[in-house]
Amino acid sequence: THHCSGADIVFQFGTGYNGVRNEDGSFSLDKLIELVHANSFIKMIEIKLHQGAKPGAWSILPKNKMTEEIRQTRGIKVGEDSISPGYHTAFSNTDELLIFIEKIAKFTGLPVGIKCGVGSLDQWYELASKIKSTQTGPDYIVIDGAEGGTGAAKGSYVDHVGIPFSNAFSSVYKIFQHYGIEKDIVWIGSGKLGFPAQVIYAMALGCDMINIGREAMLSIGCIQAQQCHMNTCPSGVATQNVWKQAGLNPELKSVRFSNYLFQLQKDVIEITASCGYSHPSEFSTENIQIHSGDGNSLIALEDLYNYKPTKTLKQNENS
């Protein structure tokens, strides 16, 4: 119910189909349609294939962390944990994914996108090829780097599974460039990008926008205790324990969160202006340099990843 306060919402569902599921845990298109029609503030729909922090892994929300409101919203029976398996049951291959996306778009009338961590690139080649040949597919793609954060993932996943954002995004973007369809997709970056320099870095790689999670949580008091799944969050951010929730004062924390967003935007605008641009989307891979392997020299992202974002090429041509 806190979503009904005026903000626009991207409704995301993953393998558990929480909020849009049948009693057996399968996806319910009827419930999604009903949800969208009843809540006009839902502006986009996002299908989470995987997340960068734990790609391919299953997850659980323990029953002791679910209030009655959460249980009803998710569609979970009393006394049961909320389980999200490591795979989708509504589709099993690329063709079925595209059909699934188009069906949701048709019956909701909303933009539909996908969020995914990156591993093998074979499936991305297949996806790009079939998007081009069928003229169907997602309106936007969220590339979630391995830096993506969660307090509930296994350490082995967080530390070793998945590809970091810059490598992941550049690899996928170049595949779509190869098929000439990168301009048909809105690109969103995710994974520890909530700092001014990282925002510009992501824009230079070709992102149209970024997602922010961890940094926003830090602004309201998260101390990265990684106890989210234990219901013992000491700062009150990720717990249903009433006593611990007292550590989170909404009136105070909302101001701090607002300050964070304002300062982030301010810093990005100032850096952009200092570099001679009017908008951060004007940055290209040629503008960002990083230390090379020996640490004694610099290399531009353009040379490292061997591409320029198409939108930047068009801007340069128009200028």
Residue ranges and their predicted role:
Residues 4-12, 135-137, 144, 293-309:
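Terminal amphipathic helices with adjacent charged low-complexity linkers/tails
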Residues 221, 249-319:
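C-terminal extensions of enzymes
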